[in-house]
Amino acid sequence: MGIQGLLPQLKSIMAPIGVEALKGQTVAVDTYSWLHKGALSCGDRLCKGLPTTRHIEYCMHRVNMLRHHGVKPILVFDGGHLPMKGDQETKRERSRKENLERAKEHESAGNSRAAFECYQKAVDITPRIAFELIQVLKQEKVDYIVAPYEADAQMTFLSVNKLVDAVITEDSDLIPFGCSRIIFKMDKFGQGVEFHITRLQRCRELDLNGFTMQMLLEMCILSGCDYLPSLPGMGVKRAHALIQKLKGHEKVIKHLRYSAVSVPPQYEENFRKAIWAFQFQRVYDPVTEDIVHLSGIPHGSSEDLDFLGPWLPQTVAKGIAQGNIDPITKEPFEGKTESSALAFDKVHLNRESSAPSNGKKKLDLPVQRNVLTNYFCLASLEAKRKFRAPKVTPKQQVLNGSLPSPRIEDSGTPDLIEDTSLPSNNIQVYQCSSEHFSSGTPLDDSINTASQCSSERVRCDIPRDDSASVSPQCSHDIGSDPAEDPDIEGNKVKVNFCNRSTIPTGSFLEGTLPGISDPFLDSHNTEPSRAAPRYAEKSNVVSANRNITVRSSYFKTVNKRVCTNQGEDECHDEDNCETGNYTLPGDQQRSSGGILKRRKFSDPQNFEDGMFQPTSPHESPPVADKGCDSDSHDGINTNSEGKFGCNVAHVNKYSGIAEKSMDKFAALISSFRYAGSRASGLRAPLKDVKNTLPVRSVLRPPEQRFGCTAKKTTRVPLQSRFSSDATNSTDVPDLSTFAYRPTTASAHSDQGKITSKATDAAAGPPDLRTFAYAPTRSTTSRFDQSENTRKAMCTADSPPDISTFEYKPMKSAVRRSDGSKFSGAALKAARRTSRS
């Protein structure tokens, strides 16, 4: 656990360091901190007792990293339990049990992630786990030592006695122990931070000037450590302030008791024992091979020192230090464990062979036993059937005198095939890999061919005569040799098509290869072979110098494929691979002039002579669907003067069908001619009764018809501005009657005139100026007031004057005898306002 909150307070004096800086030095390593980190990846297996080596591999990776950079590591293991940490060990054991129970509950509930996290907290690194790592260290010749009790005290002993140059750990307890050089937080790349005890005076977070090692130790114990828990509310900063002020733990404890802080009765005694545990703990001395104290015990102390660790015999202490005796049970370990052996095989640098952790042997299969090779190398039953050489007539020998020998072409680089003697009575069609084979062979009764390639092009050009003798030229792909089958079926040719791809004809019809002898030429043909002409385009024509055009037959039942025969026999649906059987009848009639008629699927006896006559689009006969959509065109013939690719007469039939379809579509669309109807034509448009125009006008109506013009009213001569000008309107209410006007004195003689004028204004439209607030004037006004009134009334047709809405002070209705001069001044000011 260490000192809680101490390392963050010393951050300013921590310096980054790399493993390269430790080259040639010896470092002590807190191995249990590495084991705890490595156990995070296999906590569930360690808790269940299942064999695993991940934690060992974690430690050995870092050991090899140190050795790779020239650093000599000494791994230090924890030993037995220290009596001073009894309470702390009890708490940790209780926490591990609780986490183990939670992990089992989560695992039974199916929450594997939460269970794994609880397993990580429940892992207990036991001496048995450490023993497995020790066995690997022995085989790797890495130095190690098992402390009799605490590894922190053992590493401090090695550091103080200059047996090591630095200590690698994650525990801050080494600072109060007095270790001079510590490396914290070292990762797998060898990067960490370095603490040096000489930098304590430069700490910025805590003022440690004047602090001795005893004061630093007491400050750490007061803030809380593994040997003594801290008091409530006591942390590193408060402990630092108290120690800095009072200089000793006795005065601090006395000060806390007088400060109403709850201090347990045994706290001071336990504090003293904690100091002794940090200073005088029992450790193993590798020089004397015996147990010694971390530092010399002062003379005169006669108390029991078993709280520093019980005394052990030298043989037991040595056996524990060497890893042969369990430091807790004090019994020897059993023999070499399986996990340590497996771990050694994994981390050994010069191992010849490594065994996997699960113990399974590596599956080593020959090439032919793999699934991939089985898929490509096994031949089907059709490919294993042998072929019988057909009989050849002299007429066919003349026709096939120019057939070429087979040739191999692979990506533009010809490779010669080994010399193979093919029998004259058997022809084997090979399985395809990446080579192409072309052979000319006459047929009498039947040919049984099979192709197992994933992409092939089967092309057969067969001239026929009255005797039903056939001489095909087929280009196939070559693979492995299939076995022969004695069973032969007559009068049928079976071909398997799988994603066929077109192969240029000209590239395979030139030259001969000495490696393969043509069975037909060897046994029957006496004329020398002549090279066939090279074709620039893909075609089903075998020879251009003869007036014979032969197309290969088609499947009888072909589903889900659309095939065309204009220049090449390719299927548009190349994604589907189907196999079909078709029959070449032995008796096929041949018309005069070298015209070969194509057989129809639905009726093999239905043939037409002559060229296909184009018909009108509307008289196209219905197309019968017998399994192939576009292959079975009735009556499509070829003559000796042209090629089959030039015959496009069947286009007229489909153009007629398309024209009929377009006529129907146009007739359907023509019914929706009304503007406003939907473009989709889902429903008829709604009839507009009011609008009878065929085309709706898009012009905007004249805005003059809707223009707003001002209505002129009859002027009333010389009306007061307190009344409205309109007198002719009787329908529109006069809003001016609702205007607020202050009442004037009843003594004025002109009050009746004002009232009568306001009444006459009810007949006209409302004047906004009547809503202006204006004070009433006395009856004894000057003569020039009428001029202002006349000017104001002349502007009735113009927009209202905003100045009329100004606030004007009212004049008193009853004139005072001494206020004449003030009345005159007020009238002049009112006159100026009205003029403006």
Swiss-Prot record:
Needed cofactors, names only, are: Mg(2+)
Give one GO biological process term.
Answer: DNA repair
UniProt name for this protein: Exonuclease 1
The record's subcellular location field reads: Nucleus
Give start-end positions of Acidic residues composition bias: 568-577
Q: Give the record's family classification.
A: Belongs to the XPG/RAD2 endonuclease family. EXO1 subfamily.
What organism is listed for this UniProt entry? Oryza sativa subsp. japonica
List every stretch annotated N-domain.
Answer: 1-99
